[in-house]
């Protein structure tokens, strides 16, 4: 097989694709972009209950003013009004400007009119120009070299700093910066001087500088025509703060002497990155010092850290006042604060100390006044925001305590998280005073404990707050000789029995394993509180209800079977219903030592899991190995009519096996899921060598070359082969991306994600051999379908959510989610492709990467982002599915317009979109504050799956391939209608690589 030119992913494209991947090596911004015009989640839901969620002419209702988010929104609107003055290089003429404003205001209604005039159905995107994904940095050497000759040293005066600060504060990209960040950037700008006629920027030339006019006048020239002037205090080159791109105008000096302040994009973003990283680390450290949060998980602490708000106070300014209602926790980051009660000074708070923690739990007035003694900076979080990103704090803390205790329990340790959550949800929480007998033998309790504990009573309990002593009863006569000298015994006796202290349990500990394992065993201990105590009690009836009527042994057996089957691909992605039915179909069979279980050469029809005992595997008379408890064998017999490759015999006096027959399995798993499993197992079984591949045709072209359909000659299996030119990779400085792409693809194993079979390399190319996906792009499918209905949108969005959820569970950010990067398989189910932008996240990322229309605000800005960026793209896709155009920048002519619309544009819904559940979900996904974006809280994707939009959708049947896809592909669909045989290729034996190609040694 010879060399092909290539693309870094298995993709097919339109003749004029709107695509491709991206990896702009630049820093991007932070978790707190400007808030959306969409109401915050709670507000949005409130508005949904009104008469209408859409205002006249497709306008979305505006949220009322007052909250910090809404105040930021108003500031954004004011900034938009100032933009024409602040960025005059984008002005052309007054008439053109007014026309542009009209277009922006009527953008969505104009789309509606087009749709109404069309016969039907509504079309996706219309004639919009969609930007390609940002891939690599443009060369700015020419501009950089020219500007170097104008650079001068200058000490900034107070008036200089004031001018710079004012300009930065009104800049859209800088709108989310705090005072410290603006100050750092003001100190980072450089001074440039110019003479009349000097050129600052050239139209079409790539640039990386953002400028503020210090003095003089400059003219704006577009296509050799002067269209505007730039005066002192005005700025230009805003797009350069986001990424290097071609200048849209030439800027030339008009004055005899003129000067600019300028900052390079790399300096700008590196400054923000350093500040953001340092602030996050500091805030995380401060949060760790709050004892109140010590029972939170690391992930929960990170969520809170991302949501912390920085607040500054001047000397003498009250931070909180005694008697006022409190709902905010404050941590001092710098400065000092005086605590006073009833006008009496009590103490002084220093850096790292905190106050107001009770305000997060209880509706009670402040117990003291706290006043800044000097300039003081605090980080804070309010109860409302905390509830939105984490949930009710007390419930979260208690749940964490119980979850950790269950995971350490000998009985519950093997329970899956979902089962543990159900157990936690069934407990009863009760408070007890000091020295209270909470439980006694045979479940005798004080009368105030209520009839709750009648029948089988309490079987298990957790200590949430306080401390309890646990006593055992012993026969007094048999232990009298030792009890007098035992410090752990109690002198109180009941009849001929006396109490002996056996344990003292504190917060986070639990008791009752023996009573869970023996449901009918009478409670034989005494539990007493050592102080005010809060317990969570699990009763026998609650335990039975939670376990679905099964006893604990049956549940443990079920969990063991579940854990074992989920290790195998053949069972891993069955639906929950299919899995439950399969596990219940297992029967127990016993064999005695020496008895053959299966015989070499016979046709297999059973799958086995070892419950107890040991088996030996024999090839002929040769002993190969032994298998023990919870090992398994024979799974291939469920899918294939194959002869057994070995004999398996019992190797202990008794061997108990869980067994399922093939005919039972085929009654449970059938149709599309069975076909999918057969194809996947066959693909995994095939041992592919490069020399055995035959090129059939080209199916796609991209940045690095082509994608080819190839056939494996020995088995006739077909695959897609992406052929990546090493020279192109090196020229575009993409070595790390290609290597990471391979690493991530090799780890992926999900039915809705493209499967990498293996990789090859030779002197000129790298090769990705993947499964062949023949149904075409989702991008084309939604254009065939027209505007998607509720079920169609549910099907595609839910499939995408499951694929991205799988990646996020492995801490992988996809970062270029869009319909072009999703293919349909022959059954109409989705396959996520193109991992050229994916990244294994460790902390926060700062790289600007992805396709502009689908970028989250925090990616565009410069202060870091996490996995939340992918969740924003869910909202863009859903909007495109159901509304037609893109939500932001649909009619934009350049990337700056797209970015401006994403950061500050209104989210407007066409009049023909009437599904209020869908509208609400879009608003919550397209929330500019990632901390409160649905799917980004500590609940993760559970909040999306349980949203009202999916209330009538069966996620389980989707996973089991038991739903009808919106579009069933007819035949095979490829973008590239290439001639048979693809490109002419030369044979290559894989000659030794030169040293400079060491980066691709893993291929």
Swiss-Prot record:
Inhibition and activation profile: Activated by cGMP. The cGMP-binding domains acts cooperatively to activate PKG. Inhibited by the antiparasitic small molecule 4-[2-(4-fluorophenyl)-5-(1-methylpiperidine-4-yl)-1Hpyrrol- 3-yl]pyridine (compound 1).
Location of the Protein kinase domain: 693-950
Annotated positions binding 3',5'-cyclic GMP 2: 625, 634-635, 637, 644-645
Region entry cNMP-binding domain 1, spans: 173-289
Lipidation sites (N-myristoyl glycine): 2
Keyword set includes Magnesium: yes
Pfam families: cNMP_binding, Pkinase
Cofactor(s) the protein needs: Mg(2+)
Region (cNMP-binding domain 4): 570-669
GO molecular function, one term: cGMP-dependent protein kinase activity
Region (Disordered): 1-141
Region (cNMP-binding domain 2): 292-391
Active-site residues, record numbering mapped to chain: 816 (proton acceptor)
Enzyme Commission code: 2.7.11.12
GO CC field: cAMP-dependent protein kinase complex; cytoplasm; plasma membrane
Lipid-bearing positions (S-palmitoyl cysteine): 4
Reaction equation(s) it catalyzes: L-seryl-[protein] + ATP = O-phospho-L-seryl-[protein] + ADP + H(+); L-threonyl-[protein] + ATP = O-phospho-L-threonyl-[protein] + ADP + H(+)
Residue numbers binding ATP: 699-707, 722
Gene Ontology BP annotations: protein phosphorylation
Amino acids binding 3',5'-cyclic GMP 1: 237-238, 247-248
Subunit structure: Monomer.
Biological role: Serine/threonine protein kinase which acts as a downstream effector of the second messenger cGMP.
Record-linked PANTHER family: CAMP-DEPENDENT PROTEIN KINASE CATALYTIC SUBUNIT PRKX (PTHR24353:SF37), CYCLIC NUCLEOTIDE-DEPENDENT PROTEIN KINASE (PTHR24353)
Entry similarity comment: Belongs to the protein kinase superfamily. AGC Ser/Thr protein kinase family. cGMP subfamily.
Name of the molecule in the record: cGMP-dependent protein kinase
The organism of origin for this protein: Eimeria tenella
């Amino acid at each position: 097989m010879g060399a092909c030119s290539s693309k870094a992913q298995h993709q097919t494209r339109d003749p004029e694709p709107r695509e491709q991947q991206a990896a702009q090596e630049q820093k991007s911004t932070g978790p707190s972009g400007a808030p959306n015009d969409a109401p915050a989640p709670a507000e949005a839901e409130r508005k949904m209950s009104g008469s209408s969620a859409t205002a006249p002419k497709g306008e979305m209702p505006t949220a009322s003013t007052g909250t910090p988010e809404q105040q930021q929104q108003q500031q954004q609107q004011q900034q938009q009004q100032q933009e024409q003055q602040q960025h005059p290089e984008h002005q052309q003429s007054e008439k053109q400007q007014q026309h542009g404003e009209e277009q922006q205001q009527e953008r969505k209604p104009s789309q509606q009119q087009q749709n109404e005039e069309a016969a039907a159905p509504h079309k996706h995107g219309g004639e919009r120009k969609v930007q390609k994904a940002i891939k690599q940095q443009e060369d700015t050497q020419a501009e950089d070299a020219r500007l170097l000759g104008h650079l001068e040293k200058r000490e900034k005066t107070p008036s200089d700093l004031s001018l710079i600060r004012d300009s930065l504060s009104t800049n859209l990209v800088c709108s989310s910066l705090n005072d410290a960040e603006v100050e750092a950037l003001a100190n980072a700008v450089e001074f440039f001087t110019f003479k009349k006629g000097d050129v600052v920027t050239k139209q079409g030339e790539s640039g990386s500088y953002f400028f503020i006019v210090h003095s003089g006048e400059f003219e704006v020239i577009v296509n050799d025509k002067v269209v505007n002037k730039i005066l002192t205090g005005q700025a230009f080159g805003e797009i350069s703060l986001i990424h290097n791109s071609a200048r849209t105008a030439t800027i030339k000096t008009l004055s005899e002497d003129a000067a600019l302040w300028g900052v390079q994009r790399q300096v700008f973003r590196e400054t923000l990155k350093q500040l953001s990283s340092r602030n996050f680390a500091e805030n995380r450290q401060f949060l760790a010092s709050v004892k109140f949060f010590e029972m939170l998980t690391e992930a929960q602490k990170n969520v809170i850290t991302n949501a912390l708000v920085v607040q500054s106070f001047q000397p003498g300014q009250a931070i909180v006042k005694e008697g006022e209602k409190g709902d905010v926790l404050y941590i001092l980051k710098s400065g000092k604060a005086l605590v006073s009660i009833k006008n009496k000074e009590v103490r002084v708070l220093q850096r790292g100390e905190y106050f107001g923690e009770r305000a997060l739990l209880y509706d009670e007035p402040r117990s003291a006044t706290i006043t800044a003694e000097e300039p003081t900076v605090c980080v804070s979080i309010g109860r409302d925001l905390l509830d939105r990103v984490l949930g009710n704090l007390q419930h979260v803390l208690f749940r964490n305590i119980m979850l950790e205790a269950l995971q350490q329990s000998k009985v519950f340790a093997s329970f899956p998280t979902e089962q543990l959550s159900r157990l936690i949800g069934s407990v009863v929480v009760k408070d007890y005073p000091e020295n209270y007998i909470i439980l006694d033998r045979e479940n005798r309790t004080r009368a105030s404990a209520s009839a709750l504990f009648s029948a089988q009573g309490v079987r298990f309990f957790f200590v949430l707050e306080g401390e309890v002593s646990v006593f055992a009863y012993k026969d007094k006569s048999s232990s009298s000789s030792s009890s007098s000298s035992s410090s752990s015994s109690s002198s109180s006796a009941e009849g001929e029995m006396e109490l002996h202290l056996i344990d003292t349990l504190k917060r986070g500990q639990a008791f009752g394993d023996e009573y869970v394992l023996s449901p009918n065993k009478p409670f034989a201990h005494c539990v007493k509180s050592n102080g005010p105590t809060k317990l969570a009690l699990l009763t026998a009836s609650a335990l039975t209800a939670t376990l679905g009527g099964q006893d604990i042994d049956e549940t443990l057996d079920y969990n063991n079977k579940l854990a074992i089957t989920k290790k195998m691909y053949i069972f891993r992605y069955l639906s929950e219903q299919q899995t439950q039915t399969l596990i219940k179909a297992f029967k127990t069979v016993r064999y005695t030592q020496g008895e053959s279980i299966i015989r070499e050469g016979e046709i297999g029809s059973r799958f086995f899991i070892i419950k107890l005992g040991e088996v030996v595997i024999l090839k002929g008379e040769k002993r190969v190995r032994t298998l023990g408890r919870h090992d398994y064998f024979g799974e291939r017999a469920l899918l294939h009519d194959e002869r057994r490759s070995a004999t398996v015999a019992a190797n202990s006096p008794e061997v108990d096996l869980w067994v399922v027959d093939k005919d039972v399995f085929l009654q449970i798993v059938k149709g599309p899921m069975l076909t999918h499993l057969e194809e996947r197992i066959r693909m995994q079984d095939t041992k592919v060598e490069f020399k055995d591949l035959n090129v059939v045709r080209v199916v796609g072209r991209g940045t690095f070359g082509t994608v080819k359909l190839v056939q494996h000659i020995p088995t006739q299996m077909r695959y897609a082969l992406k052929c990546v030119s090493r020279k192109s990779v090196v020229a575009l400085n993409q070595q790390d991306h290609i290597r990471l792409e391979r690493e991530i693809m090799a780890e992926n194993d999900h039915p809705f994600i493209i499967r990498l079979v293996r990789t090859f390399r030779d002197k000129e190319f790298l090769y990705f051999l993947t499964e062949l996906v023949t149904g075409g792009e989702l991008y084309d499918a939604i254009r065939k379908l027209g505007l998607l209905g509720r079920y169609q949108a549910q099907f595609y969005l839910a499939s995408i959510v499951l694929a991205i959820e799988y990646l996020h569970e492995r801490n992988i950010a996809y970062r270029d989610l869009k319909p072009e990067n999703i293919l349909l398989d022959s059954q109409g189910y989705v396959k996520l492709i193109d991992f050229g932008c994916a990244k294994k996240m460790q902390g926060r990322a700062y790289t600007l990467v992805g396709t502009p229309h689908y970028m989250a605000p925090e990616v565009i800005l410069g202060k870091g982002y996490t996995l939340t960026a992918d969740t924003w793209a869910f909202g863009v896709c859903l909007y495109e599915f159901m509304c037609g155009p893109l939500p932001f920048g649909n009619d934009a002519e350049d990337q700056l317009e797209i970015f401006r619309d994403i950061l500050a544009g209104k989210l407007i819904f066409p009049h023909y979109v009437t599904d209020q559940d869908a509208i609400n979900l879009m608003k919550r996904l397209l929330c500019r504050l990632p901390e409160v974006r649905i799917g980004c809280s500590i609940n993760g994707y559970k909040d999306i799956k349980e949203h009202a939009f999916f209330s009538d959708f069966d996620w389980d049947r989707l996973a089991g391939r038991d739903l009808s896809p919106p579009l069933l592909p007819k035949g095979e669909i490829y973008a590239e209608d290439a001639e048979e045989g693809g490109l002419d290729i030369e044979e290559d034996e894989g000659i030794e690589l030169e040293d400079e190609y060491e980066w691709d040694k893993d291929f």
